[in-house]
Design a protein with these regions (language model features):
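C-lobe/activation-segment region of protein kinase-like
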Residues: 111, 125-182
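ATP-binding glycine-rich loop module of kinase domains
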Residues: 9-51
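Hydrophobic residues embedded in beta-strands of well-ordered beta-sheets
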Residues: 70-72, 127-128
Length: 182
């Protein structure tokens, strides 16, 4: 068995109901993950690779755009997905994820990952990392706040909806970030 043995871990129809289906697959190789798209989008692809190399140096191992498709090889991040049932969803765990996402927003601003599902958060003891950066781009503050709240509710239930817009904890953070990065 060599490094090229793989198995398909996800297949997604990107735009269902269109003339032809745009499909993205994710393969788990022994040495890396590969996302493959059966279509091309150079306007997304090249800036996306550049952004990832800036925000997460070394995460992209290889990438290629052809006439018929595109693919990106990603470094394997050690640890378990936060969605793993071994993690107890107690207040300490919820607080740890909440604090990590806010820290990530601060770290990557003006970009925002915006796919903070537990399945995209990898925990390895005290280290926490994000995977699946496809939605990451420069975002408006309102969008970051809305997606943050939607993610926390999806991850932990409606009791974890955040505060009203006027006193949302991300507002002062985002305002401060936008002022310091001018």
């Amino acid at each position: 068995v060599d490094q090229y043995d793989d198995f398909l871990i996800q297949k997604v129809i990107v735009d269902p109901g269109q003339t032809w289906n745009k499909i993205r697959t994710v393969h788990n190789y022994k040495t890396h993950y590969r996302k493959h798209w059966n279509y091309t989008d150079p306007e997304w692809f090249y800036p996306h690779i550049e952004m990832l190399n800036k925000l997460r140096p070394g995460f992209v191992i290889n990438a290629r755009l052809t006439k018929k498709g595109m693919w990106i090889d990603y470094k394997v991040i050690p640890g378990q997905k936060a969605s793993d049932p071994d993690f107890v969803r107690d207040e300490q765990f919820i607080s740890r994820i909440y604090d990590f996402v806010i820290s990530n927003i601060k770290e990557t601003y003006p970009y925002a990952h915006c796919d903070w599902a537990l399945g995209n958060i990898i925990i390895d003891d005290t280290n926490i990392e994000l995977i699946d950066w496809d939605c990451c781009r420069i975002q408006k503050h309102e969008h970051i706040i809305r997606i943050f709240d939607e993610s926390m509710v999806k991850n932990f239930g409606p009791g974890h909806a955040n505060f009203k817009k006027s006193n949302h904890p991300l507002i002062p953070i985002l305002q401060s970030l936008s002022e310091t990065r001018r």
